[in-house]
From Swiss-Prot:
PANTHER family for this protein: MAJOR FACILITATOR SUPERFAMILY (MFS) PROFILE DOMAIN-CONTAINING PROTEIN-RELATED, PLASTIDIC GLUCOSE TRANSPORTER 4
Primary location: membrane
Modification after translation (UniProt): Ubiquitinated. Deubiquitinated by creB, probably to control its activity or amount.
Keywords: Cell membrane, Membrane, Quinate metabolism, Transmembrane, Transmembrane helix, Transport, Ubl conjugation
Gene name of the encoded protein: qutD
Organism: Aspergillus fumigatus (strain ATCC MYA-4609 / CBS 101355 / FGSC A1100 / Af293)
Protein name: Probable quinate permease
Length: 542
C-alpha cells in the first residue's frame, strides 16, 4: 500500500483530492507559522547577550531575571487565551475568512509595536506588542483548524488539519535557528536581537495577502442560510458539478446535520453557550477537548520551546551558541517527524493509537533523562566536554521529541476541530484553544522557577503526567479518523470507546450502499437535477 493511501468512508472521486484544497489549507496555516515562530524564537532571543545588556539583565539578580523573562514570554500566552474567545463572535457572524484576516491584522500590529522597544524606552512596548501578538495567534488558533476541517473530505481531514501543525513546525524551525544565525554572523548590538523580532512580520504579511483570496467555508455559509454561495464554493473546492452523486451525498449530510441542530442545540449565537452549560454530551466533549491540551502541555514540550537554553543547561550543555545549536537540531527533528505524521500517520494509524504510543514512549525518555540528571548532577559537576552519560541523555531527549511530535503535538488540534456539531464548532474550538493557551501560560510562566527549585524533578513530573494521559485516552477518547463531521454524535455515543470507530464506520458503509442503491433505483440523473435546480445558473464551470 502506498504511503499516501487513504482510508475512505465512501467511494471518493479523484477530483476531490485536488490542489485547491491543499492551497487553501496552506494559506490558512500561515497563522500557525506565526505561532510556531513566536513560540520558538523568544527563548533564545532572551538569551542573546545583546538583548540582556540593552535591557540591563546583567544588573539584576537571578530571581529578577527569571521573573522578567517569564513575564515577557507568558504575556503572549495571556493574550492568546483571550484572543481565542474574541474570535468566536467574528467567526460566527462574519465567517472564517474574516476571522483569519482579523488574526493576521492584530498580530501584525503587535509585531510592529515590539520593534519600537529599546534600552531607553524599556520593556513596555515589548510587553504590549507580545499581548497584541498573542491576541492574534489566539484568534488564529481558533479559526484555522475549523476552517480547514470544514472544507476537508473525511479521508484526508487529518492530513489537511495537519498542514496547520506543519506550519507551526516550519515557523518553529526558523525561530529555533535564527538566533544561532544572528549570534554567529552579527556582533552584539541592537540589530542582532531586533532582527528575530522583525521576522515575525513575514508570516503575518503572507497571511493577510493570501486570506483575501480564500474561499469562505461552505459549511459556515450553509449555517447562515446562504445556500447558493455554499454550493458554489463547495463545487469549486471539490471540482465536481452539483449533480454529482458525491456532492448530493455531502450536501444532504450537511442539510441533515443542520436540521438536527435546529431541533436540539439551535443555530443562534447564544445557543451554543446554553448547550455548553446544559447539554451533557456537549459538556463531555468540551471536557475531552480541553483535557487533551492539558495532557499536551503536561508533556513538557512548551517548557522546552520557550526555555531551551535552560533545559539544555540542566542536561549539561554549556555555552550560549552550543545551546542554540542544540535547540536548532530539536527544531529539525520536530519538523522532519511532522512530515511523517502528516503524510502517513494521522490518517492511516489514526488519532487514538498515536496518542497512546506517543505518551508511553515520551514518558520513558523523560524518566531516563531525569534519572541521569539525578545521578550525574551536571549543573553541580560541569565538565569541558559532555560525558558518555550526557550524550545518552541527549539521545533520549531527541528520542522523546520523536515520540511526542507525531502524537501529542498536532493530534489534539485535529481532534478538537472535528468532534463538534457545526453550530458548536466555533465556541468549542474557542474553549479548546483557550485551554491550550491557559496551560501554555502556566508552563511558560513558571518553568524558570520549576527548574530552579525542582531540578531533575521537573523531568519526573512531566513523565508522570504522560503516563496518566495513557489511562485518559484509552478509556475516554474514541478514534475519529475517516468519520464525517456529521457523524461525530453517533461516534461519541457508541460504547465501548475502544470499539466505537469500527462500529460507526461499518454502519456508515452500510448506509452508503443503501443510499446509492436507492439513488440508482429512483433515477440518478433526475434526482441530481432536482437537488440543484435552484442554483444551477450560479455554479462555476469546473
Amino acid at each position: 500500500m502506498s504511503i499516501l493511501a487513504l482510508v475512505e468512508d465512501r467511494p471518493t472521486p479523484k477530483e476531490v483530492y485536488n490542489w485547491k484544497i491543499y492551497l487553501l489549507a496552506a494559506v490558512a496555516s500561515f497563522t500557525s507559522c506565526m505561532i510556531g515562530y513566536d513560540s520558538a524564537f523568544i527563548g533564545t532571543t532572551l538569551a542573546l547577550s545583546s538583548f540582556r545588556e540593552e535591557f540591563g539583565f546583567s544588573t539584576m539578580s537571578k530571581t529578577a531575571v527569571n521573573l522578567v523573562s517569564a513575564n515577557i514570554v507568558s504575556c503572549y500566552q495571556a493574550g492568546a487565551f483571550f484572543g481565542a474567545f474574541f474570535a468566536y463572535p467574528i467567526g460566527h457572524f462574519w465567517g472564517r475568512k474574516w476571522g483569519l484576516l482579523f488574526a493576521g491584522t492584530i498580530f501584525t500590529l503587535g509585531a510592529g509595536l515590539m520593534l519600537g522597544a529599546n534600552g531607553d524606552r524599556g520593556l513596555g512596548l515589548l510587553y504590549g506588542g507580545r499581548v497584541l501578538a498573542g491576541l492574534g495567534v489566539g484568534a488564529g488558533s481558533n479559526i484555522t483548524p475549523i476552517y480547514i476541517s470544514e472544507m476537508a473530505p473525511p479521508s484526508i481531514r487529518g492530513r489537511l488539519v495537519g498542514v496547520y501543525e506543519l506550519g507551526w513546525q516550519i515557523g518553529g524551525l526558523v525561530g529555533f535557528w535564527i538566533n544561532y544565525g544572528v549570534s554567529e554572523t552579527l556582533a552584539p548590538s541592537h540589530k542582532q536581537w531586533i532582527i528575530p523580532f522583525a521576522v515575525q512580520l513575514i508570516p503575518s504579511g503572507l497571511l493577510l495577502i493570501g486570506a483575501v483570496f480564500l474561499k469562505e467555508s461552505p459549511r459556515w455559509l450553509f449555517s447562515r442560510g446562504r445556500r447558493e454561495d455554499a454550493i458554489k464554493n463547495l463545487c469549486w473546492i471539490r471540482q465536481l458539478p452539483a449533480d454529482h452523486i458525491y456532492m448530493i451525498e455531502e450536501i444532504g449530510a450537511v442539510d441533515q446535520a443542520l436540521e438536527e441542530q435546529r431541533t436540539t442545540i439551535g443555530l443562534g449565537f447564544w445557543k451554543p453557550f446554553k448547550a455548553a452549560g446544559t447539554n451533557k454530551k456537549v459538556m463531555y466533549r468540551l471536557f475531552l477537548g480541553s483535557m487533551l491540551f492539558f495532557w499536551q502541555n503536561g508533556s513538557g514540550i512548551n517548557a522546552i520551546n520557550y526555555y531551551s537554553p535552560t533545559v539544555f543547561k540542566s542536561i549539561g550543555l554549556h555555552g550560549a551558541n552550543t545551546s542554540m545549536f542544540s535547540t536548532g537540531i530539536f527544531g529539525v527533528v520536530k519538523t522532519v517527524v511532522t512530515f511523517v505524521w502528516l503524510l502517513y500517520l494521522i490518517d492511516r494509524v489514526g488519532r487514538r493509537l498515536l496518542l497512546l504510543i506517543g505518551a508511553a514512549g515520551a514518558a520513558v525518555c523523560l524518566l531516563i533523562v531525569g534519572a541521569y540528571i539525578k545521578i550525574a548532577d551536571p549543573a553541580s559537576n560541569p565538565t569541558q566536554e559532555m560525558t558518555g552519560g550526557g550524550i545518552a541523555a541527549m539521545f533520549f531527549f531527541y528520542l522523546y521529541t520523536v515520540f511526542y511530535t507525531p502524537s501529542w503535538n498536532g493530534t489534539p488540534w485535529v481532534m478538537n476541530s472535528e468532534m463538534f456539531e457545526p453550530n458548536m464548532r466555533s465556541l468549542a474550538q474557542a474553549c479548546a484553544a483557550a485551554s491550550n493557551w491557559l496551560w501554555n501560560f502556566l508552563i511558560s510562566r513558571f518553568t524558570p522557577q520549576m527548574f530552579a527549585k525542582m531540578e531533575y524533578g521537573v523531568w519526573f513530573f512531566f513523565a508522570s503526567l504522560m503516563l496518566l494521559s495513557i489511562v485518559f485516552v484509552f478509556f475516554l477518547v474514541p478514534e475519529t479518523k475517516g468519520i464525517p463531521l456529521e457523524s461525530m454524535d453517533v461516534l461519541f455515543e457508541s460504547k465501548p470507546i475502544w470499539r466505537a470507530h469500527a462500529t460507526v464506520l461499518a454502519k456508515l458503509r452500510e448506509d452508503e450502499e443503501q443510499f446509492r442503491h436507492d439513488i440508482e433505483e429512483s433515477g440518478y440523473s433526475k434526482t441530481g437535477e432536482q437537488q440543484v435546480e435552484h442554483v444551477s445558473e450560479d455554479l462555476p464551470k469546473v
